[in-house]
Amino acid sequence: MENVTLINSYNGIRIGPEPNVRHRIRSVVGCVLRRGIWLDNCTDIGRIENVQWHCHWWSSPKVGGDWEKLYKYMWQNCEGFVFARTDWEYVTNTFIFPVKIGYHFIATKNGTMNGQLCGIGADASNRCIVVDAIQPMGLLITNGQFVAFEGENPIEILINPTCEGSVRLQNSDFWGPAIQNVVSHSKSFVSLSNCYFSSGRQKEKALVEADNGKIQIEGCSFATAEPSILLGNGLKHAIVTGNNGDKGVKIAFASDRSVQAEANHLKDGAQNDDSQVVSGVRQDRIARTANHQDSLQPE
């Protein structure tokens, strides 16, 4: 499917649940009300490239549209890209505005997804990404841009406790007045590398929070004054290294498991000191190296 505009579709494109392979969707744009692309039961590599969903195709006065009604309906109801079973999916240069959930990863009787997503974006959302279920090797997300501010408790990325696969984000931006940027309840691995985090909406909740599984946060920048990172009760292991912030990197720790904090920016002129970086953690739970050591786990 190529070079198509959808003006006012309720559901845009459905692939599956019948068995299928090697779809290619390229240079498709338009306004979708409930779902943009819904994908399931693809057992050989599919590709989605240069797809943009936006309310302006149908909200224009030239076609008798009403921006306010359409905008509200989409952020309250629309899911831009829904992925169930698909193997080795390639998603490149995609975007949606506005949206309830930009990219939703789910399980069906056919299974779940693994794949890579590069140059993806979601704006005016309640959730940019929600991960309910993925395959163990999971998701590789690179060069993402995520903005959430609509509805109750807007969060850019939410990884639910039903997730048992790896989620890895590299070189991505999070901004706009979201309550939080990333919240992970995942049982598996989460990696955040070379990302930009910000909000400015409130001062209580951490921009990044994890309370399950294992997380790595490396080489990231925290641009606003909220607590940067909350390592919550239930987290199995954390590596936090080489990060900086507008007024330092503020890390709160509520778990009895090990955390490794090294070479993080505390405040202007300060050297890294684990007792300053991590609040509320026993010193024997802090690793002095940047490598995961099983011996650091409590008995």
Give the ranges of each region predicted by the language model:
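Extracellular/periplasmic carbohydrate-active domains that bind, remodel
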Residues: 1-299
